[in-house]
A protein has these predicted regions:
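Acidic/Ser-Thr/Pro-Gly-rich, low-complexity N-terminal segments
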Residues: 1-11
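Acidic-enriched and Gly/Ser
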Residues: 10-170
Length: 172
């Protein structure tokens, strides 16, 4: 006798961009963009966080990030290799609080004096923060990343051939 298979409960579909927006809106500080030497982006991000701790401004500098993307490179004619690379070469995004007049100069100088940083995007002496929408557009998942995650999730939930599902037929 065949047992009826109960339909598996589907996890609620979560829009990755909406989830990212929700997470971003809960974070303190504003996002600023730094110019850096190309090729030094990851090192600058790491150095900024170390300097924030060393100069005791970690309560004002919350995050330094370099948007990355995964691409497939084809080498030697047919060898495919997944490579992670900087999405926007020469730029680092820093989430910080420059609203306190007593500490803003120290925070600004900590960032500006980091090796390989050439300056802030915007006014030379008064950094201009990104709007929320600009920050989401630059730091959020790209449509390609969303599609890849959805494809991977669909592939993970699809039953494999020969996965033990049996079909009972009436006969004999």
């Amino acid at each position: 006798p065949a047992e009826s298979a109960e339909p598996a409960e589907k996890a609620p579909v979560v829009d990755p961009l909406a989830e990212f927006r929700r997470q971003m809106s809960a974070l303190p500080g504003q996002w600023y963009v730094l110019h850096t030497y190309s090729g030094y982006e990851r090192r600058v991000a790491t150095d900024i966080m170390a300097r924030a701790e060393n100069f005791e401004v970690e309560d004002y500098i919350f995050d330094a990030t370099v948007p990355m993307e995964t691409v497939i490179e084809i080498k030697n004619g047919n060898k495919k290799k997944e490579v992670s690379r900087v999405r926007i070469p020469g730029y680092v995004f820093v989430r910080m609080d420059l609203d306190d007049p007593e500490t803003s100069d120290k925070v600004w100088r900590t960032i500006k004096d980091t090796p390989a940083v050439t300056g802030f995007v915007g006014d030379r002496y008064n950094p201009v923060p990104l709007t929320f929408e600009e920050a989401v557009a630059q730091l959020g998942p790209t449509p390609e990343e969303i599609a890849a995650k959805e494809a991977a999730a669909a592939e993970a939930t699809a039953p494999e051939s020969g996965s033990g599902t049996q079909i009972a037929t009436g006969g004999q």
